[in-house]
Amino acid sequence: TAIAHLESCRHRLNLTIKGDVLVHRVLFDGKRATGIQAESGGETFIIEGDEIILSAGAIASPQLLMLSGVGPDGNLGSVGITPVHTLEGVGQNLKNHPSLSLRFQPKAGYSLPPDSPRNQVVLRFAATGSSTRNDIQVQPLTSGPKGKEADEIRVGCRLELPESAGELTLTSADPSVQPKLDYQSLVQTQDRERMREAVRTCVRVFGHQGFDGIIEERISPSENDLASDASLDAWLDRNIGVAGHTCGTCKMGPASDPSSVVDQYCRVHG
């Protein structure tokens, strides 16, 4: 965004870019947004405008709406915020890619260098019975700081389009306190079945004799983990995480949809 849009216009007289600012809430006149209250360098101040654009991502956008009194009454009331406008869909429909790693011990000379590209896609396929093409993504991973990686090969499995959806809720009226993220990963049976297949497919692929000269042994999951659906489910639950694409918490849709938050022009309903 900075390279594509800001760099060429950052010197315009009618544009101010200010970093290190924490927005506390959106200000309203009735149900019309008129400005924001923010903090920077220990100073709290108000910025007003004819149009207030909230573009803070899938975590901070619903958080700011709720801190401003726009959201589900139950969650707002639980942290002492007086509702300005009840909108039950704010923070709902929280989604991300369920993601986990298989771990292998490499033979001498075949460790994955920590400065390798973060993601290197090696395999995409559709799980059995899936209506989504190529809904499983597999790639070798590096993630730690240079020189801090364990001497192992990690292979990431990612479910690209999950059915499961969770919610984001406030735990405090303090804008500096992170909200609670409950992704409900693999709650839907189809998601769990697809993830089981992804893991078993990776075990089979990386157990092929073509990798005998590279991989010494599989560290995780173990043979006991793979012995049954129940044992594999337990391993999934211990290891499941999410990838970097949180979305859905300010859903676009018609006002008649109680789970939607904005219309086709990204205007908040109500």
Which residues are covered by each model-predicted region?
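FAD-dependent oxidoreductase catalytic-site/capping-region signature
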Residues: K107-S111, R118, V122-G270
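Non-transmembrane alpha-helical segments in soluble domains
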Residues: L6-E7, P62-L65, D73, R196-V203
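Glycine-rich loop(s) and the adjacent beta-strand/alpha-helix scaffold that form part
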Residues: R25-V26, G35-P114, A173
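General small-molecule cofactor/ligand-binding pocket signal
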Residues: T16-K18, T82-T86, Q139
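Conserved redox-cofactor binding core of oxidoreductases
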Residues: T1-G41, S101-Q105, P113, P221-S222, ...
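Loop/turn elements at helix/coil->beta-strand transitions in domains of secreted/extracellular proteins
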Residues: L13-T16, G49-D50, G270
